[in-house]
Amino acid sequence: MYRPRPMLSPSRFFTPFAVAFVVIITVGLLAMMAGLLIHFLAFDKKAYFYHSSFQILNVEYTEALNSPATHEYRTLSERIEAMITDEFRGSSLKSEFIRTHVVKLRKEGTGVVADVVMKFRSSKRNNRKVMKTRIQSVLRRLSSSGNLEIAPSNEITSLTDQDTENVLTQECGARPDLITLSEERIIGGMQAEPGDWPWQVSLQLNNVHHCGGALISNMWVLTAAHCFKSYPNPQYWTATFGVSTMSPRLRVRVRAILAHDGYSSVTRDNDIAVVQLDRSVAFSRNIHRVCLPAATQNIIPGSVAYVTGWGSLTYGGNAVTNLRQGEVRIISSEECNTPAGYSGSVLPGMLCAGMRSGAVDACQGDSGGPLVQEDSRRLWFVVGIVSWGYQCGLPNKPGVYTRVTAYRNWIRQQTGI
């Protein structure tokens, strides 16, 4: 008799392998959708920069506000930046606001005007006109906050990335994180990248690297006097810019070399010189000046500093062709002058920096190069000039630098800076 074929129950189809396959496909689709969402949220946004000015009604302008090196300039700038930041953090723009920076404090009448750049991150489809209106509405509330009386300007200018770079590279001591108003600070490894130390100069004798230096204006380089002891004629010297001494971004002839009259090759006292360039240097992301400290700036033992240069990696070795950087600590003159150290050879116009264990140090070919420190506003100041030391990287024998604060008036007399 005919018997129909039995129907397979649905449960027979869903074997463990089939269930696993469905789960894998489902998870894969969900992961893909999440990835697309993350990509959209991350890459749909871009940075927007704006410039504005603020009149400070209850602060009188003084000469101390003329330089970012002074305590007064730093304190007032930080107060203004904190007020603006707090206002945006408590507004509807809190998720879009990134950072603000006072570019300059200037005189207007007897009062102070602060020029400020602000950074936001928002959708690429952002309506700039609407964004500008929203920013203005937040800034209008500044007059009633904090203990500064601020009158925000109604003028808010949208800046391109290039505009922002042009504005911020006119300020001394700006590294890449400040030029882009980034929240990240990265200094890693020993190899410097283009733009990391934009004030670094290679002073070359007959087109061969001989000493380092630091650009302190568009016409002047700060360096060590001992670099020119045997070769004082400027016609043999050029200054190059960029991380490579073999293929520099820019090469400029030297017009004049002004070494300190009191330099002693015996005591190494007054080991400082300024070099005048033959032509003005145009500032950019990769080439601009470092800040000079105030004569009263306190260099604190134990604080972090960075030394940069093309010096040899070991005592007696060859110079390198790509710029290197080293993190060191400031060491007190008392510690540096102990019998285990330099036994009193470190004079008041000198500064010690290195590591107690040795290892990281300036070496031959680094002479004249800068020792720099960062302030609370991410501006970098040259506090030392590579001068001398016993060999390189030995315990208790740190590098000895010319103390720039001790020669601040001399630098001003020679250069007008």
From Swiss-Prot:
It comes from Mus musculus (Mouse). Signal peptide: none annotated. InterPro entries: Pept_S1A_HAT/DESC1, Peptidase_S1_PA, Peptidase_S1_PA_chymotrypsin, Peptidase_S1A, SEA_dom, SEA_dom_sf, Trypsin_dom, TRYPSIN_HIS. It is a single-pass type II membrane protein. Residues 186-417 form the Peptidase S1 domain. Coiled coil: none annotated. It is an enzyme of class 3 (hydrolase). The active site is at H226 (charge relay system), D271 (charge relay system), S367 (charge relay system). GO terms for cellular component: extracellular region; plasma membrane. Residues 46-162 form the SEA domain. Monomer. Residues 39-417 are extracellular. Keywords: Cell membrane, Disulfide bond, Hydrolase, Membrane, Protease, Secreted, Serine protease, Signal-anchor, Transmembrane, Transmembrane helix, Zymogen. GO terms for molecular function: serine-type endopeptidase activity; serine-type peptidase activity. CDD domains: Tryp_SPc. It is found in: Cell membrane. Residues 1-17 are cytoplasmic. The gene is Tmprss11d. The chain crosses the membrane at residues 18-38. One of its GO terms (biological process) is symbiont entry into host cell. Disulfide bonds join C172-C291, C211-C227, C336-C352, C363-C392. Highly expressed in the esophagus, tongue, and trachea, low expression was seen in heart, lung, and adrenal gland. Isoform 2 is also highly expressed in the adrenal gland. This is Transmembrane protease serine 11D. May play some biological role in the host defense system on the mucous membrane independently of or in cooperation with other substances in airway mucous or bronchial secretions. Preferentially cleaves the C-terminal side of arginine residues at the P1 position of certain peptides. Plays a role in the proteolytic processing of ACE2. Isoform 2 may play a key role in regulating adrenal proliferation by specifically cleaving N-POMC. Belongs to the peptidase S1 family.
